[in-house]
C-alpha cells in the first residue's frame, strides 16, 4: 500500500511569516502564543519561515487558530490569508 504524500505548500513559509508580522510578534513571541514554547525553539520558527523545515500539522493548526484563518488558507497555495 502506498503512503499518502505529505502536505506541501510553496507559499506556507511566507504565510507563516505574514501572520507573525501582522500580529507584530517576534519569533520567540509567536512560539509562546501558538503554545509550543516548551517543545520548539525560535530557530524552528525561523526554519519554517524560510522553508527549510515543514512544521507539524499541529503547528500549522495553531498558527491558523491564532490568526483566525481557515487552515486551508495556509496550506492551499491558491488561497490568500487576507
Language-model region placement:
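A short, Lys/Arg-rich alpha-helix, primarily the initiator
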Residues: 1-23, 32, 72
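Base-recognition residues in the alpha-helical recognition helix of bacterial helix-turn-helix
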Residues: 43, 47, 58, 76
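Charged, helix-prone or intrinsically disordered regulatory segments positioned adjacent to compact structured domains
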Residues: 79-82
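DNA major-groove recognition helix of helix-turn-helix/homeodomain DNA-binding modules
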Residues: 24, 52, 56-73
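Short alpha-helical DNA-recognition segment
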Residues: 24-47
Amino acid at each position: 500500500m502506498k503512503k499518502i504524500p505529505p502536505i506541501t505548500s510553496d507559499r506556507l513559509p511566507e504565510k507563516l511569516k505574514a501572520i507573525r508580522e501582522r500580529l507584530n510578534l517576534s519569533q520567540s513571541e509567536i512560539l509562546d502564543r501558538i503554545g509550543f514554547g516548551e517543545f520548539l525553539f525560535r530557530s524552528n520558527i525561523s526554519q519554517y519561515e524560510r522553508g527549510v523545515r515543514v512544521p507539524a500539522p499541529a503547528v500549522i493548526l495553531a498558527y491558523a487558530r491564532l490568526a483566525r484563518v481557515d487552515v486551508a488558507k495556509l496550506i492551499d497555495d491558491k488561497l490568500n490569508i487576507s
